Amino acid sequence: MWITTTPWSKHSPNWVLADNGEKLIVPEIILGDAQGPTRNEWYIGLSSVLGFSFWSPDYDGVGTWLDAATQLNEQGGGDVITYSSGAHIVRTLLLAASQSNVHSTFTSKALGNDQTSSMTSSTTAVTVAKSGDGQQQTGEQKEEDWKDISKADLFKDDPYVLKNFGDSTTQAKMQSGGSTNSNGNGSQASLAFTKKALSLLKFLVDNKILKKDKVKEAIMNPDQYLSKRSKLDSNNQKPTKDDFIGSEFKDLYENAAKLNRFNSIWAEKDTDNAKFLITVVDSYFPVLPVPAAGLNETSPTLLKPWFQFRSAPSGNGTIRDYGFIPENK
C-alpha cells in the first residue's frame, strides 16, 4: 500500500501508524514534539526521521547517507545501522556476476591468475592520499566497460532497475506508475545494471575489500551462501547470535569495515555508479518516512508488511525491520 507524507515542523502534526487488527495502514495525527532533537542531532546520530530514504529530499550532504547505510563492522554485520544494506549490495554483486552469460568473462578479466589479476587490478585499485587541508583525495582510475558481455537478463523484471536503467520510454512508464513487460527494454536495463555490478565487484576485489578466491567460488555457486539466509527466513533453522543480518557473506570479506568507504569512493567516480548503488539500496530497504523539517514535496513510500516501529527520543521515528537483531534475542 502507498502512503504520502507531507511537510512537517516541530509544531505541526506528525504521522504514525495504528494497528487496526486488519494489517492496514491507518494514519493517526499526533502533536509533534517541540522539545525533540534538532535535525542536525537526528542526522549526526543516523536516526533521521526521513527513514534513510535515498530518493526523497533530505538535508545537505546527501552523499554521506550511502556511506552510512552500507557500513559494516569487521565481521560483516551492520555497524551503525543493524539492518545495513551493505550485505545486500554484496548479494546483488554476486548474483550479477553468477549469470551464465557473465561469470566466465568476469572471472577471466577480474579474477584470473595472479599475473593477469595484478595487471588488471592496477586500473581500479585506489590510492588514498591526504591533501594539505586534511581531506582525502583519490586519483582518477579507469573502469572496465565489459564490452564482451552482450546479454544479462537476471534483472530485466526488477522495477527498480527498469526505473533507473531502462530507456527513456521505460523510465517514463515506471515514473508514471505504469508497468512494462520483459522486452528489449528490460534486457537493456538489466545489462546496464549488470555491467555496473561487475565494475563495483571488481573494484572491491582489487582494493582488498572482498577476497578474490572466495568471490570466484561464490559466483560459481552462489547458493552455498544465499541458502544460509533462506533457511533462516523460512524458519527451517533457528537463528543464533552468530546469524546476524548478512552473516552468510562473512567469509567473503577481507576488510568488511571499509566496504562503505569504498562504495562511496566508487560512487564518486561516475553518476551512474551512484545511481547503481542507490538503486540497490532502495530496492532492499524501502521504509515509511515521517515528515521532517526540510522536506519540500510529498514522498510516497511502499511499506513492507513485516516492518515495525523503531522507538526514538522524540517518539516513533521510522519503520524498521528488526530482523535478527542480537539485543532482541
Swiss-Prot record:
Q: Where is this region: Disordered?
A: 109-147
InterPro entries assigned to the protein according to its UniProt record, in alphabetical order? DUF5396
> Tell me, what's a Pfam family for it?
DUF5396
Superkingdom, taxonomy of origin: Bacteria
Q: Which portions of the chain have biased composition (kind: Low complexity)?
A: 116-131
Q: Which family does it belong to?
A: To the C-terminal of MG321/MPN_456.
Protein's name in the database: Uncharacterized protein MPN_457
- Organism, by scientific name, is Mycoplasma pneumoniae (strain ATCC 29342 / M129 / Subtype 1) (Mycoplasmoides pneumoniae)
Its ancestry begins with: Bacteria, Bacillati, Mycoplasmatota, Mycoplasmoidales, Mycoplasmoidaceae
